[in-house]
């Protein structure tokens, strides 16, 4: 071969012009050459463009039917059959409405946001998260108790939209098709039946502030969060196609419903029913808009949440199923952790019942299951990584009740 002076025989990359001595490899094509550095650069460009295409196609490629949405929810959420059916239909109709708006149809379908009522730990947040994951849309959670109306110490309602924007990597189009779950919405109920002349900055005022973004408006969002100030530049976000799901335990609402139901049963023509103890979920299932207004939600706010899904209180059997049946069940999660240590973890049926019973005793629902298991397994999770030849760990009822230690099975064959 000749030298670097452009004489025949000396090969150069057809893209960057570097000579064969300046690169590690040159790949030959018909009358062209490409070096290893240009190949790496091309790979990066292709990967970046593929990512941009994926982002542009955010959202489901085909909107799942209500039955398909419910089937997906069944994989992660145990029980709550009626609530899952209501949510599946509501979410399907919402995104059909979004598609129709984009197609420019002249018939306007009004937005239907969702209100979920149910005891603590019954699965409200998990349902909302699972829906967003299934539909491949950005998702944000806000705590209503942190919100105050504009001008008071606390968080502006627009910061909820900022959380969604951040979840969408500041992609405006994606964010405007997302889902926002507002938790503890019962805590912003008005403190009395009649409007107060004093300011209720974390109650009725917040409901009023939420009204516009929930029904659909162009919100001015501070890009870095915090309070608004005149010198700041704002991001304009259209909330018309954002699905809002509000949730809360609504403790005390059952009394309002019972009171209303009781007045209807008075008089000679009243139907006499046999008295039986009703669960909180059964009572909440009879919720009417007027009950929510009496509880402390303003009529306009109730009107923006036309779809109401009530969740039942979880019993022991449901909690045991939650521990072992869903795709990401707690038992499977802990078994995976131990599997990484090459140890098989087994929970006896008695242990699972004991965990469920303790959660019921604490009145924490499914939310308290993890802390009970963590507490019971702290010592064994501390010791196992330092021990050799451990084959299996068995967690029984006594371990959960702090009355015994886990059974550890060693691999004798390995020590022989």
UniProtKB/Swiss-Prot annotation:
Family matches, as InterPro entries: AAA+_ATPase (IPR003593), ATP-dep_Clp_protease_ClpX (IPR050052), ATPase_AAA_core (IPR003959), Clp_ATPase_C (IPR019489), Clp_protease_ATP-bd_su_ClpX (IPR004487), ClpX_bact (IPR046425), P-loop_NTPase (IPR027417), Znf_CppX_C4 (IPR010603)
SMART domains (alphabetical): AAA, ClpB_D2-small, zf-C4_ClpX
A GO-annotated cellular component: HslUV protease complex
Record: residues binding ATP: 119-126
Single GO biological process annotation from the record: proteolysis involved in protein catabolic process
Keyword Metal-binding: yes
Entry coiled-coil feature ranges: none
Record has Protease as a keyword: no
A GO MF term: protein dimerization activity
Gene3D superfamilies: 1.10.8.60, ClpX chaperone, C4-type zinc finger domain, P-loop containing nucleotide triphosphate hydrolases
ClpX-type ZB domain boundaries: 1-54
Superkingdom field: Bacteria
Quaternary organization: Component of the ClpX-ClpP complex. Forms a hexameric ring that, in the presence of ATP, binds to fourteen ClpP subunits assembled into a disk-like structure with a central cavity, resembling the structure of eukaryotic proteasomes.
UniProt similarity note: Belongs to the ClpX chaperone family.
Function recorded in the entry: ATP-dependent specificity component of the Clp protease. It directs the protease to specific substrates. Can perform chaperone functions in the absence of ClpP.
Protein name per its UniProtKB record: ATP-dependent Clp protease ATP-binding subunit ClpX
Organism: Syntrophotalea carbinolica (strain DSM 2380 / NBRC 103641 / GraBd1) (Pelobacter carbinolicus)
Source taxonomy: Bacteria, Pseudomonadati, Thermodesulfobacteriota, Desulfuromonadia, Desulfuromonadales
Encoding gene, per UniProt annotation: clpX
């Amino acid at each position: 071969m000749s030298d670097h002076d452009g004489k025949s025989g000396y090969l150069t990359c057809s893209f960057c012009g570097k000579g064969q001595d300046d690169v590690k490899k040159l790949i030959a094509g018909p009358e062209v050459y490409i070096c290893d550095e240009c190949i790496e650069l091309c790979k990066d460009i292709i990967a970046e463009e593929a990512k941009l295409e994926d982002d542009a196609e955010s959202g489901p490629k085909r909107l799942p039917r209500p039955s398909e949405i419910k089937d997906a929810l069944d994989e992660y959420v145990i029980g709550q059959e009626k609530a899952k059916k209501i949510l599946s239909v509501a979410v399907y109709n919402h995104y059909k409405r979004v598609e129709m708006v984009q197609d420019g149809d002249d018939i306007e379908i009004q937005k239907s946001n969702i209100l979920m009522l149910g005891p603590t730990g019954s699965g409200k947040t998990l349902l909302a998260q699972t829906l967003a994951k299934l539909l491949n849309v950005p998702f944000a959670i806000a705590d209503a108790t942190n919100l105050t109306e504009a001008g008071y110490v606390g968080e502006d309602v627009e910061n909820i939209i900022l959380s969604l924007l951040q979840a969408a990597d500041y992609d405006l189009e994606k964010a405007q098709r997302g889902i926002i779950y507002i938790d503890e919405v019962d805590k912003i109920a008005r403190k009395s039946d009649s409007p107060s002349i004093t300011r209720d900055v974390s109650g009725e005022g917040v409901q009023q502030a939420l009204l516009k973004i929930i029904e659909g408006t162009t919100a001015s969002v501070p890009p870095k969060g915090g309070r608004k100030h005149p010198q700041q530049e704002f991001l304009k976000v259209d909330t018309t196609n954002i699905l809002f799901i509000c949730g809360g335990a609504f403790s005390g609402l059952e009394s309002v419903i019972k009171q209303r139901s009781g007045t209807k049963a008075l008089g000679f023509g009243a139907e006499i029913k046999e008295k039986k103890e009703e669960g909180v979920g059964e009572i909440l299932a009879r919720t009417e808009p007027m009950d929510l207004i009496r509880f402390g939600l303003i009529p306009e706010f109730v009107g923006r949440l036309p779809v109401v899904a009530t969740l039942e209180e979880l019993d022991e059997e449901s909690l045991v199923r939650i521990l072992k049946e869903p795709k990401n069940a707690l038992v499977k999660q802990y078994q995976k952790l131990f599997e990484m240590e090459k140890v098989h973890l087994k929970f006896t049926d008695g242990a699972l019942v004991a965990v469920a019973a303790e959660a019921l005793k604490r009145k924490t629902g499914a939310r308290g299951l993890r802390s009970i298991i963590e507490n019971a397994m702290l010592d064994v999770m501390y010791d196992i990584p330092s021990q050799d030849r451990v084959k299996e760990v068995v967690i029984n009822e006594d371990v959960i009740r702090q009355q015994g230690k886990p059974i550890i099975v060693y691999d004798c064959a390995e020590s022989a």
